[in-house]
């Protein structure tokens, strides 16, 4: 799976492509853009059989595609000032792209501060904690994951420590779509 911007012009054989276009919303309570299946957006997520590289590629990594049916999910996560996504995992692997603000990502083996325009990959089942660093406005990222079909319409978010469920959860997730891909048995 790869995340690319508008300067990516290669002809690739994508299994599936999702696009996200910047909108006008700047508040945390609604999506900041519009996502659809397609390949002509401000930001694109390409599910390909081989890694892509070159101009416009913001990141590319191998993604485990579940056996049988699966879905491509595109959503946005908005962090108002003070928001923390406590250590958690997701059922699906995928790319994130920071649209606004600064976000500290505390992964299993390192900590990185992401700035608007940065992209990062999170493998399925890999614990991560995210802390919004801005003092005003909203920090927001767009995410595209490959998820098992049984998670269509269901959150993939799983707290790593159940005790964290008692902590405040200020971030808001805005799901654009789950696009089901049915695998032909023959």
Please place each PLM-identified region on the residue numbering.
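Short, conserved beta-strand element in jelly-roll/cupin
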Residues: 14-32, 90-105, 141-148
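Ligand-binding loop in jelly-roll beta-barrel domains
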Residues: 28-57, 124-152
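Conserved hydrophobic/aromatic beta-strand scaffold that supports enzyme active sites
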Residues: 43-45, 74-76, 95, 119-121, ...
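Surface-exposed interaction/gating patches
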Residues: 62-110, 184-185
């Amino acid at each position: 799976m790869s995340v690319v911007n508008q300067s990516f012009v290669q002809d690739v054989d994508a299994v599936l492509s999702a696009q996200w276009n910047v909108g006008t919303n700047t508040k945390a309570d609604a999506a900041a853009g519009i996502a659809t299946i397609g390949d002509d957006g401000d930001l694109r997520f390409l599910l390909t059989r081989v890694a892509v590289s070159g101009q416009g590629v913001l990141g590319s990594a191998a993604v485990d595609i579940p056996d049988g049916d699966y879905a491509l999910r595109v959503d946005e996560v908005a962090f108002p000032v003070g928001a923390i996504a406590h250590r958690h995992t997701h059922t699906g692997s995928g790319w994130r792209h920071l649209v606004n603000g600064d976000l500290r990502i505390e992964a299993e083996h390192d900590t990185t501060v992401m700035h608007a325009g940065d992209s990062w990959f999170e493998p399925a089942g890999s614990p991560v904690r995210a802390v919004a660093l801005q003092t005003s406005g909203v920090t927001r990222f767009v995410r595209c994951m490959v998820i098992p079909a049984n998670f269509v319409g269901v959150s993939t978010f799983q707290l790593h420590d159940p005790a964290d469920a008692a902590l405040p959860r200020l971030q808001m997730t805005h799901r654009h779509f789950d696009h089901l891909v049915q695998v032909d048995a023959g």
